[in-house]
Amino acid sequence: MSKISIIICSYNRANYIGAALDALYLQSSGLENFEAIVVDNNSTDGTPEVFTTWRTHHPEGSFYYTTETKQGASFARNTGAEIAKFDWLCFIDDDAIAHKDFVQNIIRHINDQPFVHGFGGRIIPRYIPAEPKWMSYYVSSMVGNFDYAPVACAFKNGKYPLESNMIVSKKIFEQIGGFNTQLPGVVGTVRIGGEGKDLFYKIMDLGHTIYYDPTIIVEHVVETKKLTKEYMYRVASGMGRGERARTKAISQKAFVYKIIEYLFKLGAALLLGINYALQGNPAKTGPIIQFRIDTLKGLLGY
């Protein structure tokens, strides 16, 4: 039976890392089928002490703690992958709560798809205390909402799993060189995203199909008080910065095509915003348009 190395990159989530570990500890698959590696990426909020206390009260299973001082999720995830013992790598966030059959369904998917090299699952936002009235389906991707299809299927070209719930074989991960550290994620107050997209595009370029399985579920904690305009700008512009770095590394032509794509998406956002207003949901209009403006600004280097 395949076994899983679950890698949790953590940065200042002492309030949530315990819940993430609890969910793994209670997996229906049993503790013998996976290991969990917490990679602390320079936390300053007592995360090491939280892990030590948690481990004292949960001595069974294979749960490990390590550090990575180079700031950014790509560095931390690569560190976790280097020390992982098993043939499959699963990456989740430090505020992601895995459903009880999470590991069991990952193993089942691997057994059902013997030639699979990468796949991902569903991500459900867990809003605290409640979903904001201005949140829409199109903006919710910024807080991790991901529900690609109602049944297991292959991703279409241009689609891929999100970083909070993705699984790759260690062999293919090492073959492509892991996560691109030129797309590190969050470094200080600057976000340069797209590391998961870059990873899966490289796997696809090798001729492999990426799959989606909606039974592999995590809930992503979203504190609505943190969803300020400044926060949403950092996330959206970070997506654009990541695409700027990724496409420019391919060619100037790829970068120009991405600008055209983003302009098209901005136009679509304007139409969607008008539609929300006409439907009596004007609170959703501004955020969906601002999202596309901010991603375009990041793409253009602003």
What are these language model-derived features?
Residues R13-L26:
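Short, well-formed alpha-helical segments that are part of the catalytic scaffolds
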Residues E68-A84:
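Glycine-rich, basic loop-to-helix element that forms the pyrophosphate-binding segment
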Residues D101-M135:
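Conserved donor NDP-sugar-binding/catalytic core segment of glycosyltransferases
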Residues G121, Y138-K159:
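Short, flexible, basic/aromatic active-site loop/helix in glycosyltransferases
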Residues R234-G242, K248-Y302:
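Non-catalytic, C-terminal membrane-associated alpha-helical segments of glycosyltransferases
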Residues L89:
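Short aromatic/hydrophobic "clamp" motif used to bind/position activated sugar donors
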Residues A23, D40-E49, A96-I97:
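A conserved acidic beta->alpha catalytic loop
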Residues E163-V168, I172-G177, L183-I216:
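A short, conserved alpha-helix in the catalytic core of glycosyltransferases
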